[in-house]
């Protein structure tokens, strides 16, 4: 039995928990909060040049005002395709073509929609918590496996405490991110 069998890779556990947090921030970025943000356009792909191309690869996206996103499409022949992709995306924003520029006025959210988005954000946060707890479970399984091949009881306790500390830190980060996102959503 080697010493490597008794080591727990905390860095790998931390990376997987960080991955869950990154996925949560990506999900939060896709929620429309009533404020203009280029991230609401990230999931949109345009049928360009014979393939599905991310919108941000077809032009520059700017946020000149709190309720306005402006897209300057580089290839003027793609303007109608970009406009159609935005309309068909289901993000609920009507693009306005103004020459070579597409303007996206972000409508004000009503109270009911804000509460609905807040619940969606809470759902995303819960998914992240579950993913983090699954990583914790995998780490604890590694510890049990190491114990079965000769890890000392004290070492098992130390590693378990380390994994739990990483889990607690990650869950706290999820809760903080959710609180911030819900505050942003509910702000009029």
Curated annotation (Swiss-Prot):
One of its GO terms (biological process) is cytoplasmic translational termination. It is found in: Cytoplasm. Its main location: cytoplasm. Transmembrane segments: none annotated. GO terms for cellular component: cytosol. InterPro entries: Ribosome_recyc_fac, Ribosome_recyc_fac_dom, RRF_sf. Gene3D superfamilies: 3.30.1360.40, Ribosome-recycling factor. One of its GO terms (molecular function) is ribosomal large subunit binding. Keywords: Cytoplasm, Protein biosynthesis. Responsible for the release of ribosomes from messenger RNA at the termination of protein biosynthesis. May increase the efficiency of translation by recycling ribosomes from one round of translation to another. NCBIfam families: frr (TIGR00496). Belongs to the RRF family. This is Ribosome-recycling factor. It comes from Cereibacter sphaeroides (strain ATCC 17023 / DSM 158 / JCM 6121 / CCUG 31486 / LMG 2827 / NBRC 12203 / NCIMB 8253 / ATH 2.4.1.).
């Amino acid at each position: 039995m080697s010493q490597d069998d008794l080591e727990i890779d905390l860095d790998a556990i931390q990376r997987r928990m960080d991955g869950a947090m990154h996925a949560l921030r990506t999900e939060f970025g896709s929620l429309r909060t009533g404020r203009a943000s280029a991230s609401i356009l990230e999931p949109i792909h345009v049928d360009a040049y014979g393939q599905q191309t991310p919108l941000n690869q077809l032009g520059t996206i700017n946020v000149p005002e709190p309720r306005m996103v402006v897209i300057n499409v580089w290839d003027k022949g793609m303007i109608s395709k970009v406009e159609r992709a935005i309309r068909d995306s289901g993000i609920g924003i009507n693009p306005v073509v103004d020459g070579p520029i597409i303007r996206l006025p972000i409508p004000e959210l009503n109270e009911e929609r804000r509460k609905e988005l807040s619940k969606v954000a809470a759902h995303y946060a819960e998914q992240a918590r579950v993913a983090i707890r699954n990583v914790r479970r995998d780490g604890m399984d590694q510890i049990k496996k190491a114990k079965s091949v000769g890890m000392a009881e004290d070492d098992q306790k130390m590693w378990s405490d380390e994994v739990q500390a990483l889990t607690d830190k990650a869950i706290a980060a999820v809760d903080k991110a959710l609180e911030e996102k819900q505050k942003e959503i509910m702000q009029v």
